[in-house]
């Protein structure tokens, strides 16, 4: 579970055949009945059929699961891969999962299933190397030093300028002999400082609140700019008792960060491009909501 704030836009009827634009009023308060009703989603008929037929075997590990295998991050046998939407993201997503987080209860796997080319999941203490990249990587996590998404570009620019000043202070090294710093993806510090701020990667923590500080305070993440989603509220069915409704599940945090980034940083009108990140989440939300509404006992083992 990620710990950042957010509300949920909403999903359209008739399997969301038409994309409904999310209006500001829909993203700043929770709809009382269905906060996910206006999302622009692919057909969920494949999930309805899978839910009716019951658990199926994972094609890779053979485990019995509902909808997807949370261990292998793949759909199970009765959910054809070609019927699962694939979402293209503008940023790379790294999810740091606490080793004690229960895989079957985490929504982090939703992101990997739906945006496999952009999402990586690491189990703590395994954390990617971010040293020297704090001007293009942010951590989504609430705290006293956290900023809003609207201020991300400003603070990244300040970090770039700081690096530029440090470079200029190195008077003993001729500019042509300064070391060019690159990584396997072609990352180049000197090129990026010339081009201005560009966010490339976002880090999320997948953990219960009581376990998050161990990861957030890790020295490998300590220097990253912290971003908080302050206007969003969760509708997660496993919301932690006693915690504010601005603490989101992991998939909610990823989704709302991208929606806000699209509008506030890229300055483009949001038209549902990332709504399918909630493809599994919205379906499971309704299953549990309907079960509770009809007096049935909601099944916590839905995907376990």
From Swiss-Prot:
The keyword Disulfide bond does not apply. InterPro entries: DTW (IPR005636), tRNA_Mod/Golgi_Maint (IPR051521). Residues 180-193 have a biased composition (Basic and acidic residues). PANTHER family: NATURAL KILLER CELL-SPECIFIC ANTIGEN KLIP1, TRNA-URIDINE AMINOCARBOXYPROPYLTRANSFERASE 1. Keywords: Nucleus, S-adenosyl-L-methionine, Transferase, tRNA processing. Residues 1-29, 165-193 are annotated as: Disordered. GO terms for cellular component: nucleus. It is found in: Nucleus. Its EC number is 2.5.1.25. A motif (DXTW) lies at residues 206-209. Belongs to the TDD superfamily. DTWD1 family. It comes from the Eukaryota. It holds the Pfam family DTW. Catalyzes the formation of 3-(3-amino-3-carboxypropyl)uridine (acp3U) at position 20 in the D-loop of several cytoplasmic tRNAs (acp3U(20)). One of its GO terms (molecular function) is tRNA-uridine aminocarboxypropyltransferase activity. The keyword Transport does not apply. It is an enzyme of class 2 (transferase). The gene is Dtwd1. It catalyses: a uridine in tRNA + S-adenosyl-L-methionine = a 3-[(3S)-3-amino-3-carboxypropyl]uridine in tRNA + S-methyl-5'-thioadenosine + H(+). GO terms for biological process: tRNA modification. This is tRNA-uridine aminocarboxypropyltransferase 1. Its main location: nucleus.
